[in-house]
């Protein structure tokens, strides 16, 4: 199961941990993925793994 939003396709990004001494080590920034149950237009419900931002967008427009 990938860490990817089913709607926006948002996935992990890579960057650096930077210490106080400016030492840099690689790290991953993971999206805030939530599993939610969504009711579709035809009345059926399905589970989606979507990011928290897309969940807010869904709540706003539905």
From Swiss-Prot:
Q: Name one GO cellular component term.
A: ribosome
Gene3D superfamilies, per this entry?
Answer: 2.20.150.30, Ribosomal protein L28/L24
Coiled coil ranges = none
Record-linked Pfam families: Ribosomal_L28
Q: Which SUPFAM superfamilies match?
A: L28p-like
List the InterPro entries: Bacterial_rp_bL28, Ribosomal_bL28, Ribosomal_bL28/bL31-like_sf, Ribosomal_bL28_bact-type, Ribosomal_bL28_sf
* One GO term of the biological process aspect: translation
Q: Does the keyword Ribosomal protein apply?
A: yes
> GO terms for molecular function, please?
structural constituent of ribosome
Question: By its UniProt entry, which NCBIfam families does this protein fall under?
Answer: L28 (TIGR00009)
What's this protein's family per the entry?
A: Belongs to the bacterial ribosomal protein bL28 family.
What name has this protein been given in UniProt?
Large ribosomal subunit protein bL28
- Species the sequence originates in: Aliarcobacter butzleri (strain RM4018)
Q: Mind giving the lineage of the organism this protein is from?
A: Bacteria, Pseudomonadati, Campylobacterota, Epsilonproteobacteria, Campylobacterales
Give the encoding gene's name: rpmB
